[in-house]
A protein has these predicted regions:
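Conserved Radical SAM active-site core
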Residues: 101-104, 109-127, 131, 146-241, ...
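Cysteine-centered iron-sulfur cluster-binding motifs in ferredoxin-type domains/subunits
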Residues: 135-145
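Flexible glycine/acidic-rich beta-alpha junction loops that bind and position SAM and/or redox cofactors
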Residues: 252, 283-288, 308-345, 380-389
Length: 416
């Protein structure tokens, strides 16, 4: 008994066992001592228990199979668990837990080594990527979106600004005879902190000095004061990540509401700045297609096609550190309650679900097909054919098509 107890105690190390309710801990321990689960089986049981609690579903005690053979128990338990994953989520009776009601974080400046200009962190030959360059003026984000990978890379309570950012921008050498697409919303939100530490001053001046750079600000905020009070260079794009009210309320904590994001985009567009919209992630849940359709229709009715440069679609894609961090948190989320399939080394929806959500989204925007650039983000090549009826042969072909379209929309010269 003591020997197996030692094995059990070793197995629960570096797991979320101690974060489970006390009665659940005692139940798992009792069943393990009785059935002699293996090291890996104990870890699986702990993760299942934690996920069910995070999803606000039944406790593992309620669904645990009553059988004296551990193989049968594990088979039935995993089957029951996968059934919870496979069914479309319902947020109707979902209760949030320990969600922050206000943004609380510390600001600091640091002289970062090197410079934050690099390739998009998810760029891959396995997926069709646009070769976006990223410019990290700020590290970490004040929003608390449950699915976001930023939380796995940075300290969420500390927002770090590069004290040498302005000088590094001035010293950046780019080919004046080439068009670049640089995004600023990868390691943080582009607009939520406004012009703190002179970040927007520096970026706007960089855009003015480099008219061959298409500079994209991506946000979930409505903090557009700087855009409204200043002249905006015509090579700047301002884009919003949008979702349904259901997902915003339950998974995009502290971010601006859908109404506020759309109103902010309207104000910016009316000033003559080209805008765009990212539906990433599209999330499957009960009646999700009809709820997303309402958002798509609203954009079609409130914006004209010549105000919008781009619309992108993407969905949930998880790396292991993010899943681990979600399990470590004392909160509730249904964001991982989905059928997992391998997607180029990450976990995502099966292709059948992706095809449904992407094709529905694209067809909903039919009036804009000829005037707005549509694309998929982080998706494998064959999904393009299933969604749009066409694909690009290479990432470079995709990049050229995107830059050409953006340049035309912005009325700037496109240079290969």
């Amino acid at each position: 008994m003591n020997k197996y107890l030692d094995k059990f105690n070793d197995a629960i190390k570096n797991t979320v066992f101690l974060k489970l309710p006390q009665n659940t801990q005692e139940f798992i321990k009792e069943k393990s001592l009785t059935l002699r689960f293996s090291f890996s089986e104990i870890k699986q049981i702990v993760d299942i228990a934690r996920d069910l609690d995070m999803w606000d579903e039944k406790n593992i005690v309620e669904i645990f199979p009553d059988h004296n053979q551990k193989k049968v128990v594990m088979t039935r338990l995993k089957k029951a668990y996968e059934e919870f994953r496979a069914k479309p989520n319902s947020y109707d009776n979902f209760t949030l837990k320990n969600i922050p009601q206000e943004q609380k974080f510390n600001f600091k400046t640091a002289d970062k080594e090197g410079f934050g200009l690099g390739l998009c962190p998810v760029a891959s030959e396995k997926t069709r990527c646009c070769n976006l360059l990223t410019l990290d003026a700020v590290e970490s984000c004040g929003f608390d979106c449950s699915y976001c990978s930023i939380q796995s890379f940075y300290n969420q309570n500390t927002i770090t600004f590069d004290s040498g950012f302005k000088d590094k921008l001035l010293n950046l050498n780019l080919d004046k005879n080439k068009t670049y697409h640089i995004g600023t919303g990868q390691a943080s939100d582009s607009l939520m902190f406004g012009n703190r530490e002179g970040v927007l001053d520096s970026l706007f001046e960089f855009a003015r000095q480099n008219p061959n750079v298409i500079l994209e600000f991506k946000t979930k905020s409505d903090n557009i004061k700087y855009f409204l009070e200043n002249d905006v260079p015509n090579n700047i794009l301002c884009t919003w990540s949008l979702n349904t009210p259901t997902i915003i309320q339950n998974e995009e904590h502290l971010a601006a509401s859908l109404d506020k994001r759309i109103k902010a985009a309207l104000h910016v567009a009316k000033k003559g700045v080209k805008v765009g919209f990212h539906f990433h992630p599209i999330v499957e849940y009960e009646n999700y297609l009809s709820e997303y359709k309402e958002v798509y229709d609203r954009l079609l009715s409130e914006f004209s096609a010549n105000e919008v440069a781009l619309i992108s679609f993407g969905t949930l894609t998880f790396i292991k550190p993010v899943i681990k961090q979600l399990r470590d948190r004392e909160f509730r989320s249904k964001i991982t309650q989905m059928p997992f399939e391998d997607a180029s080394g990450k976990s995502s929806y099966p292709d059948s679900i992706k095809q449904e959500m992407f094709k529905h989204a694209y067809e909903s925007f039919k009036p804009w097909h000829k005037d707005v650039f549509f694309y998929l983000c982080m998706e494998e090549h064959q999904m393009w054919d299933k969604t749009f009826g066409y694909n690009y042969s290479t990432n470079n072909d995709f990049e050229r098509a995107m830059l050409s379209s953006y340049a035309k929309s912005l009325n700037i010269e496109y240079m290969i």
